[in-house]
Amino acid sequence: MNLLDPFMKMTEEQDKCMSGAPSPTMSEDSAGSPCPSGSGSDTENTRPQENTFPKGDPELKKETEDEKFPVCIREAVSQVLKGYDWTLVPMPVRVNGSSKSKPHVKRPMNAFMVWAQAARRKLADQYPHLHNAELSKTLGKLWRLLNEGEKRPFVEEAERLRIQHKKDHPDYKYQPRRRKSVKNGQSEQEDGAEQTHISPNAIFKALQADSPHSASSMSEVHSPGEHSGQSQGPPTPPTTPKTDVQPGKPDLKREGRPLQESGRQPPHIDFRDVDIGELSSEVISTIETFDVNEFDQYLPPNGHPGVGSTQAPYTGSYGINSTPSATPGAGPAWMSKQQQQQQQQPQPPQHSLSTINSEQSQSQQRTHIKTEQLSPSHYSDQQQQHSPQQLNYSSFNLQHYSSSYPTITRAQYDYTEHQGSNSYYSHASGQNSGLYSNFSYMNPSQRPMYTPIADTTGVPSIPQTHSPQHWEQPVYTQLTRP
């Protein structure tokens, strides 16, 4: 046992500085005597690497952190390594607690870290030739092989360390350092920006690069909790973590080319990752730069997406949200190009459609978009024709989109103020070429709510044929009160 003396002294020292540590004799026992096991030699032969893994050095490594391993941890380690011949333990080289000088507070270790530190130090001394990466791999494999009982002491120690850490650093907040070159975008993930989700601001930047004529602020991007019923007033800035990626950051990483380039060609953004709720009206109005056919590849094969969940692929092709009161703001994002260009010239302050209906916006839970901001010229055109919204839809291939929202249910469009039992939008025949026919956009000053102009009992008859050619005919003007 004289070989073990230095080792004993070490454990005793550590026990003294360890808060509430049990008496040194206990630690000596646990450190010095391997648990008697009949299969000692077997274990050594079958698991030579494992046997060497944890025990003596845990303490040393621990030493560099200010916490020492309590007896239970050492016992657990020696339990895992039982059968190991302790006379082989060399006198470990003491490392001065270097971290004491550093102000940087480390995170409390989790259970695996507790185990790995305890084991690694010992093994590193034991097998100096072992490469650290190999060591880590082996430790990880070993940890996965441990059963709950063997892991428990490490888990408990980790919990103790966490509580202790909380006491020592009550205002500690984990702040990972931002590394410059991490494998594609891991640093962003650490910083809380979802990598799977392209920032709407980045999309907007890409779209804006070529179209100077859409002028309005970035803060139009809307996030879920924002509709708080104000009927006029500036739009609130985005609050969700999703949008706080700096707008200039090339967030379109997955396309593999910088933003400046992607602005030049019609930008190829991966529409599967875009949440339509966060596209601002500028983005939607600039969307004419896209080739409509580019959307086709993202259309679901049978045209039956869930109304709210699969909007992302269309990035602004439809402004329909699946919450009951979303429709007032939802409008035809697909306008003919002439109308969009007309709309994009600098205009007097535009009223965004979705902020006007203050009563119903109380109940909006999901993300909404401020859809096409119709310019005053549009409003005045449509004040005379009291029929819903005749836009020139013929310039888009609507056959791609006409079948994509068949699942809208009657309950979603009931508006308490204007109907008792009539549903605002009932897909009586399950066709939805009537999608746009129900929204009449009047001047906000004269119409506080969006009511159907034709009597709502007429609405069920609106859905016409599925074939897109009929969009050109002014079929909507025939809707008058019976």
Swiss-Prot record:
Sumoylated. Lys-370 is the major site of sumoylation, although sumoylation at Lys-61 also occurs. Sumoylation plays a key role in regulating formation of the neural crest and otic placode. The keyword Ribosomal protein does not apply. A motif (9aaTAD 1) lies at residues 276-285. GO terms for biological process: cartilage development; chondrocyte differentiation; gonadal mesoderm development; growth plate cartilage chondrocyte growth; inner ear development; negative regulation of canonical Wnt signaling pathway; negative regulation of fatty acid oxidation; negative regulation of osteoblast differentiation. Residues 366-482 are annotated as: Transactivation domain (TAC). GO terms for molecular function: DNA binding; sequence-specific DNA binding; transcription corepressor activity; ubiquitin-like protein ligase binding. Expressed in both male and female gonads from after metamorphosis through to adult stages. In the testis, expression is restricted to the supporting Sertoli-like cells. Conversely in the ovary, expression is localized to primary oocytes (at protein level). In developing limbs, expressed before chrondrocytes form (stage 52 tadpoles) and throughout the cartilaginous anlagen until stage 56, after which expression ceases in the enlarged cells of the diaphysis. Residues 224-308 are annotated as: Transactivation domain (TAM). This is Transcription factor Sox-9.
